[in-house]
Amino acid sequence: MSNRIAASGLIVAALLAVSGCATTVSSGLGKAEYMLVGIDNKVVWGDDGKLQNLAPGKDTVTIVDIGTDPASPKIVASLPLMNSIFGPPTNLAITPNGQLGLVANSMDWVADGQGWKASPDTKVYVIDLTVSPPVRIDTVAVGKQPSGMAINRAGNLALVANRADNSISVLSIQGKQVKLIDTVTIGEQVAHVAFTPDGKRALAAKFPGHKVALLEVDGQKVTYAKRDLAVGLWPYNLDITPDGRLALTADNGNAGGSDGNVDTVSVIDMEANPPRVIDKVVVGEAPEGIAISPTGRLAVAVLLRGSNNAKTDWFYNRNGSVAILKIDGKKVTKVGEVEVRGLPEGAVFSPDGNWLYIGNFMDSDISVLRVHGDSVVDTGTLLNLPGKPASMRGRTQ
């Protein structure tokens, strides 16, 4: 039987110290380390696999401490903020110093006389993580349907992929001030974006274009280099290794859903001039989330496996899974797979790489996995959430 952790104490927590940094709070076990979880309670899938839109008003951005006791994460607070599953599970981020959280609300919810429909939103929430409880301090207007986002290691620049605007918003970060300073036109729908460790380049996933765009970054000036890399079908998500040598893309294969066919993770050599795809690794069916360990030795691709499809579909599975990828130099190899729960979305490693957290949308919980070298095992511990986890992200490393 799984060890389930109750979702209690949702609004109030006493984890913050005089330092004012959410990631440096001392405790008897360790230091608090925050993870943001976007809870979307407006969307459900029925047994027939059909999506249903429910009335809004119950979404939250839930803040989870994964540092004090990594084996038993705890909810610190839940802020009543609308957010959406309609985008990759990376529409939020935490600054490297742990002081700010940014959350993009991809879709607004509009009454159409017969129910509710999704319409592109333009909001990025700014959350102060240094106060107890954390609180939203600002909302920044960006492009339409802001989705995957990234913050550079310097903590002074953020990029937001605007799917409905075919653009990327550039945000400056100074202390607790976040401002829109530029918009980069891409010309095609972009789902996610990631900085290289040195902050001089970024990659953007051109979801329906089956490509990755290369961006150049000079200070606060971001330009589209007009160079694209052909990856697998429907690249929804991507990440870059801590040493900057490789990038990995989650090639979903079916426009964000499952179809029963195996799909790939594309491997990009970032040291090559110009960068290029050097391999495609078969990982399983419908990878959506992807994350690289802070150690740089391991990555995971989160597989949907038809877990939100009709139960009568031949490729339906009750649970999704996590493909384990070993990184050895520039060779990436699938070395295992761990079953989790229904419609897994986000994946977050602990800062030391010893723990892995997977958000299970259909089951409203988070699976806690233990990492031992190249092996990942399910501990059986589940953190109950106040709703369905559409996205998850830890502190920028």
Question: Language-model segments: which ranges?
Answer:
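Bacterial N-terminal signal peptides that target proteins for export
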Residues: M1-L10
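Predominantly soluble domains enriched in secretory-pathway, periplasmic, or organellar proteins
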Residues: C21-Q397
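Intrinsically disordered, low-complexity segments
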Residues: A6, A17, T24-V25
